[in-house]
Amino acid sequence: MNEDETSILNKKMEKIEVEMAEFERLGAEREKEAVERIVQEENQNPEVPSNDDASTDIKSRKEGNMKVTAEEIGLETENFDELPVSNGFGVSRRETHYGNNRTYYKNSQGYRRKPKRDDYNNNRKNFYPPIQNSTYFINATGGIDSMPYFGLNNAPGNIYPFSMYKPLEADPQYLSVPSSMPSRREAGMAYGYQNYKRGGYTPNTQYFEEPLNNTSFPNSQGKEGKNSGYRKSSRILDIRVKFGNSSMKAINFQPKKKIVHVVHNPRLHQNKVLRVSIPGSQPALVTPKHKMNVPPMGMYPLPFSPLPSAAPPIPFSPNVSSHPHMAFLPATVPTHSAPPGFVPYDFPITNDKMYPSPSFQEEFPSTSKSPSATPGSSNAPVVDMHPSADSATYPTSIYPSNVRARDDSQQAYISANMTTGEMPSMTNVPAGNAPAAPGTMYTTPLPTANSPIAYQSYSVMPTYWSFPQNYDSTVPAVYPYMPPPFSGSDMNVMSNPAADTLRSYSPASQVSTPPFGFVYYYDPNQYYVPVSNESANATSQPLSNLDTGGSAPYDHI
């Protein structure tokens, strides 16, 4: 490139720079002018005229044969809908008339219209109450007595479930319970026309009507419309319902039609077929209940802190009674020893027949054979342990520590078979872990400061959540998928660590309680599995969706 070409290029660049500077200067001037014009327009009428002043001004200008605009006529007339007003583009524009203190809108044709009531966007009082007005937490003032009874499969401590008690007043978005953080309502045709061609959610409801054969009605003999001999109380509708928005339908009975009513909702996964018996020709209100009123996983009401990051979210399990057992493990041994089966806690009464819990506190007379009843004896509860070979004399407890280790000679049982009120002799305790001779009775050592007692003589409800070995939220924890009452690796009051020889265990650490007052032990064996040697971390890998490391097989939970 010679000098001439270089000079030409430099001149072109200088010219471009000058033009760009001029362009920027003009743009800044225009922006400044626009701002000044807006400020000037806003400052033209600093004082709002009253009705009388404006009307007088219009009358004087009428007498002077001056031009009067339609907007000014609007100050003294009420027939706003007849006044065509346009802003020049036919676009809806908002005006505020100070005379009557009302706001009017202009539609696309330029006519004024009255504003719509914003019932479905702002005024939601008839859908669900404000969250801050709800006091149905389990740890509210009054404790359990202030908590309503929710039924068998409903997690206690939730916010008032409108869909259960007042289904017609409940927001259809919240089938079980409203969360403490209200999400955006689904836009549907019921909330106005704002979703027109905007991809708003509209449930696809399809009706399939299949004519029935007349021979299916006894004694009908082909008579049209006459169902003689057919009992009105046994008309059957096949109604396939997907729970969700618009799943509550009033279905008019049609005598000769088989109505298959399908409601598709992409937000839900349950699909249940209901056979509804129609007692007559009256409409049937089909209100399917949610399978279980399950709170959203990981989203608990605000007063509770989130779960520890090491443990997975805990779903509501039907293995646990519908009432929370306030059976927090005592920090110290109780001052009295209780007979077998006695639970020193006031448990609420539950109607759960499948998983019953102690519902009353028994009173024992002073002639009890418990160690504390004998003067001079220690108040420390004592549990004798005997080998399972003598199970005929000492039957096993209801919940052995490990159901697969039932024949293990090291198995410890919970029943306290105290035959006298005195402390048993400590001389026949076998050395080490050797089993005792059949028929002999030996006890745990007396508690010391460094060695607290291992087994209390009262039974405590399970203090862990019985998950499968590898927790998977997609597997329901109900029969036949129920885990055994005590997993082989748990470490609670009723487990014998020496008896579990099937696999090694790590000591369970008590973590903070999840919502609704349950105490559980976090056992890493229930949530961790070994990782293959090819992995960078060859020790263990958490199976928790709260794990920030991203355990691949369980990211979908």
Curated annotation (Swiss-Prot):
Keywords: Coiled coil, Cytoplasm, Nucleus
GO cellular component term, pick one: cytoplasm
Keyword check for Coiled coil: yes
Coiled coil: 2-45
Main location: cytoplasm
Cellular compartments annotated: Cytoplasm; Nucleus
Record's keyword annotation contains NAD: no
Region (Disordered): 39-62, 101-127, 356-402, 536-557
Bias kind Polar residues: ranges: 101-110, 358-380, 390-400, 536-548
Name of the protein in its database record: Uncharacterized protein C622.15c
Organism: Schizosaccharomyces pombe (strain 972 / ATCC 24843)
